Amino acid sequence: LWSSTQTPSELKDGIHEAFDIPQSKIKVVGLPSGSSFGQWWSNNFHMLTVCLARKAGRPVKIELDNEECMSTVKRRHLERSVGRMGCTDDGDLTFLEVDHVIDNGAYGFKDDVGFTAHDMWHPIDHANITIRGINTNKVTAGCMRGVGDCTISVAIERMADQLAEKVGMDPLKFRLKNQVKSGDAIAREGLADLPQGSVEAYLASIPESLRDAWPDPLRLSSGSTHELLRRGAKQFNFKKKWNGWGRPYKIDGSKHRAVGVGTGAHTCGVEFEGPTSALVRIHRDGSAKLYCSVGRQGQGSETTQAQVAAEALGFPLEMVEVETGDTDACPWSHGSIASNTMYRTGWATYEAAKDARRQLLELSLIHI
């Protein structure tokens, strides 16, 4: 199957599961997709193509224009957040409650998105985050860039602003007072009603023998928003321009200019079906070839992966070639979804290149 897909390996898995064809008889060649925003994963038209080709016994091609893509493949989830947030008179958060509903359309299945958005805020004694996926008679929804994180983050940020205004605190000070800092424990206790197939259910299913190696409690090792907030506020001169809630710092006719502060969280590096892998091969002329199954949406994944491999090998960049789409050559990978390309495939590439360098040096010692 030749297809403009972000996930060659997962598409191969999907064909195997749908038609019970041995994976040894399936080959997917991933082609450039252009901008996708998550559309070019494993989709219905992929399976229709395989089904028609098997029935006809002939090659089959399905081609969709932009309008057909938008109306038949999938769309962004429609989401609604309703919540409450409370604090003491001096601005210390006391409780957070969010009820988040996701419209999955006819056949969508998301019910676990945005579950880390509340981790931006310091662990609260009383918190309840409920996320529900529902099916409706609309076009099936699917993952499109920042699934759930954006919506829940905006809802929580809006509540934080309203709360800060009520206690007479500016948005910067309120966030510096309440957001998680490096070294703080991230609360993960009290998980309940985990939907089958959800991220949380996956985490809960991990054996205790593996969990023993995890830090307890789980702490934020880096990435505190405090320094970012201070630097950002300084960049646009927040102290000078902040004039109070609802009061602009400049009025020019009908234009009212004001400033605000906000933060957001996004989850990347998700792992469901298995670990991501990469392979580096050293050729007799001293050049190298990297095999990694990633998507090509115009983000330059071939270049970035080649740069990682070249640096780890100690080779010039022009001596490293990259194969990204052929599942017969490339080991299994999640592909380019959920901000995975550099975070996960990049690490796999780095480790594969380091291992190739180690083997090369060991062989050179034998011949010295």
Q: Where do the language-model regions lie?
A:
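Structural alpha/beta core scaffold segments of enzyme domains
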Residues: 1-365
